[in-house]
A protein has these predicted regions:
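Secretion/assembly modules of Gram-negative surface proteins
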Residues: 23-25, 29, 57, 90
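Gram-negative (and chloroplast) outer-membrane scaffold detector with strong preference
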Residues: 59-146, 159-168
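Cleavable N-terminal export/targeting peptides
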Residues: 1-27
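A short, acidic/glycine-rich surface segment
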Residues: 41-44, 111-114, 149-151
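Transmembrane beta-strand segments of Gram-negative outer membrane beta-barrel proteins
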Residues: 26-42, 100-104
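A short acidic/glycine-rich loop-to-helix N-cap element
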Residues: 46-48, 151-156
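Surface-exposed strand-loop-strand hairpins of Gram-negative outer-membrane beta-barrel proteins
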Residues: 40-56, 119-121
Length: 169
């Protein structure tokens, strides 16, 4: 009986330690962004298309200056649509009411052409932006990203500009 009590107590202590470590890994701060997105998409080499749509992201902070971000967008033209789902690290620093940031993201991209082919590609992106605090947890964001895809076995280098509202928590 004493041995069983010792095993149960040891398991309880181990679970308490593991639970404490796990809770330390859960982000306690971050932000949510939603806004307008403009994508200068290079579908065919040397031929760019203007796409307009939306961009949304969720960032969880693991340190005061580093977080993990998930970013999704959808941009649309007269006969074309492109969607990206990106994930990666973001570094930032708050200086008064502004928070500049830089990010490196990877993920998947999908392009669809009306009455034509569609394709899905690996995507990598690098960029940055600036959040300007308006009041309390509310800020406005300006963001510019270089996005690299390989649709239809060709390399594309797009520029995406996004702006909108950020809620910091």
């Amino acid at each position: 009986m004493r041995r069983r009590s010792t095993v149960i107590l040891s398991l309880a202590v181990l679970l308490t330690i593991l639970a404490g470590g796990a809770s330390a890994q859960i982000p306690t701060k971050g932000n949510v962004f939603f806004g307008y997105s403009y994508n200068r998409a290079e579908i065919v080499s040397n031929d760019a298309t203007n796409l307009n749509g939306w961009d949304a992201s969720l960032e969880g902070k693991f340190a005061p200056w580093i977080g993990l971000v998930a970013d999704v967008d959808g941009t649309y033209g007269s006969h074309i649509s492109e969607h990206n789902a990106l994930f990666g690290p973001r570094v930032s620093v708050s200086v008064g009411s502004v928070r500049p940031f830089a990010e490196l993201l990877i993920g998947a991209a999908h392009i669809g052409i009306d009455h034509g082919p569609s394709d899905t590609s690996f995507v990598n992106a690098a960029g940055g932006g600036l959040d300007y605090r308006v009041a309390g947890p509310v800020a406005v964001r300006g963001q510019l990203d270089w996005i690299h895809t390989r649709f239809f076995s060709n390399s594309q280098n797009d520029l995406r500009f996004s702006t909108g509202i950020v809620l910091h928590f």
